[in-house]
Amino acid sequence: MSYTQPGRDINPRDSVLKVRKTVDFVITGSGKAPQWNQTQWSNLPQAGGKPTGYSTRFKILYSDTGIYCLFNCSDRKITATRNADFLDLYNEDVVEAFFHPDESQPLYFEYELSPLNYELPIMVPNFKGRFYGWRPWNYEGARKTRHATYIEKDGTAVLSWTAEFFIPYSLLTPLPNVPPVKGTRWRANFYRIDYDNGDAEWSWQLTRTNFHDYERFGTLEFD
């Protein structure tokens, strides 16, 4: 997906998000675990497509075992028909998180989750814009993510949807700079795509070409 948004500066290295540490907790999809109260929402501005009036925001925490993410997406129509993991979820409503722990390596982790709670976790080697996603091997036990979603409705009318997920450090093996400790910095970006009226995109940091423009990712600093 490409973006053009006049007036929005591109300053990814100066965009530092502090990530607070937490104890591990249960993923439910509601985002109501008390641990989420430790941190504030960060907004994802709409970056492409027709104006929607929808808001998108996210939270992130880390523990001794992995990374926790929470997205809240206002919406009026859920566009999601794919009913299995590892499909092209980005062709329907989806949220995405990209983590690039070591800038010296053109290798990062991408995670996608649909409103129907189907996932796409992949490792991505990216050589000067040539990239392809690779599925995890032995994806079971302690290497598996935990994820859940929730669609909020008023009667039959959709109001929003929430995505909550946990990515274990063991799944990120053998990426360098993992697990993070206090003071560790990773590059990262967070996105949403919605298909109510064509495709609309939201991004934490504005990229030049597509979601895989890792040189334009923002910075996470673990607290």
Give the predicted meaning of each segment.
Residues 1-223:
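Structural preference for beta-rich elements and adjacent junctions enriched in aromatics
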